[in-house]
């Protein structure tokens, strides 16, 4: 992709929360802007910088050329270690801590850029750092949000925040929810941060903070595509300035971008093993970068995988020192029975795995990144949601996009999925009429995803239109 006329002086500044699931789409967006000829800075707490450097074998934060533009990193000390030392990590305490320190650190960084001749043209934040909009407003810098969930989830949060439709409450926890342009959501299909029984109310509170600041954003960029959620997008466009620009991971890669990713862990080499497997025989199993399953659930999954006799590539993350999780243990006879039809890794290059011809299906937690990557790669799914928007995504994958089969309904079920259920789902997604149906549908979505990010496609036009809007606001065009 080439640069846009007269936009060489535009400087887009992206601000991220910690967490691979939010850093990855921000980095993809940054690369997309840079490939259009813009200067892009990605900023986040230093812990993000530490993990990205380690995973990508980087020695410093030198700018990276992408097309005719540039992307660089500016990580900042959030002061967490000096205040909390070796105390167990508490995400809600950290969110509030970052709110306070970020409001102090960000203006200093922005003013420094102005003094050194690279003033920031636009601030873009993700929903877990709503305070960035306040900083932008105080400095009169145009501000936008990159929404990294579906438009369906955005609609749920918007209608909840404004009290426009009834949602589950403490006294009526099993209310189903009807939102404009959407199928009925059962009480356990609503993003569960909004449910009174959620064990993670702080995430809902934090995300809803973005909706209090929505008027301070001139645009809501969405990592989704119109063809996927057109009715919901049409309805929400009447209420908010939405621009779908996804799927960001499908935007053609510029070879000069070095292949740097937002991964926090080094990926294991899976290609040689996948190359050794026949076409459409391997089920990829991963529950993302945050979900950590109970040992009992891992054991049931292991036996379900063994009993299905399906080939598998299974991501089992190492335990987290920060959170204090224990390592997962596979049954003693697992490898004796699995033989060479399976491989277990600590982390994988997911985009490449899903694009590999050996991959036939994806058992996924249904995070939005994984959801889009599966659909846009033409890979059917087994939905195994846990919390947050995952339960909503699972519904759409199975009932609306028709690319998968359901394995569970999320943590509100409060049960262990059995080995028999796992075996049934694996068999259903790999052979028989259901497998053929979901594969055909997945390939249709893949084609639409490729078309929307190609030159002249709906998402690509929105991306260009956003850049032009920033240029007008800053007087550079």
UniProtKB/Swiss-Prot annotation:
Domain of life: Eukaryota
Tissues with expression: Highly expressed in young leaves, with a lower expression in mature leaves. Higher expression at early stages of petals development than at the late stages.
Top EC category: transferase
Gene3D superfamilies (UniProt xref): Glycogen Phosphorylase B
SUPFAM superfamilies: UDP-Glycosyltransferase/glycogen phosphorylase
Reactions accelerated catalytically: apigenin + UDP-alpha-D-glucose = isovitexin + UDP + H(+); luteolin + UDP-alpha-D-glucose = isoorientin + UDP + H(+)
Molecular function via GO: quercetin 3-O-glucosyltransferase activity; quercetin 7-O-glucosyltransferase activity; UDP-glycosyltransferase activity
Reported temperature dependence: Optimum temperature is 50 degrees Celsius (at pH 7.5).
One Pfam family recorded for the sequence: UDPGT
Keyword terms, alphabetized: Glycosyltransferase, Transferase
Binding of UDP-alpha-D-glucose, residues: 289, 347-348, 365-373, 387-390
InterPro entries, alphabetized: UDP_glucos_trans (IPR002213), UDP_glycos_trans_CS (IPR035595)
UniProt cross-references to PROSITE patterns, sorted A to Z: UDPGT (PS00375)
Pathway: Flavonoid metabolism
Single GO BP term: luteolin metabolic process
Regulation acting on activity, per entry: Inhibited by Hg(2+), Zn(2+), Fe(3+), Co(2+), Cu(2+), Al(3+) and Fe(2+). Slightly enhanced by low concentration of DMSO (below 3 percent), but gradually inhibited by higher concentrations. Requires UDP to be active, but slightly inhibited by UDP in a dose-dependent manner when concentration is higher than 0.32 mM. Activated by sucrose in a dose-dependent manner.
EC number of this enzyme: 2.4.1.-
UniProt note: pH dependence: Optimum pH is 7.5 (at 50 degrees Celsius).
Family of this protein: Belongs to the UDP-glycosyltransferase family.
Function: UDP-glucose-dependent glucosyltransferase involved in C-glycosylflavone biosynthesis. Has a strict stereo selectivity and shows a preference for apigenin and luteolin as substrates, but could not recognize flavonols, anthocyanins and xanthones as glucosyl acceptors. No activity with orientin (luteolin 8-C-glucoside) and luteolin 4'-glucoside. Can use UDP-galactose instead of UDP-glucose as a sugar donor, but not UDP-glucuronic acid.
The protein's name: Isovitexin/isoorientin synthase UF6CGT1
Organism placement in taxonomy: Eukaryota, Viridiplantae, Streptophyta, Embryophyta, Tracheophyta
Gene name as annotated: UF6CGT1
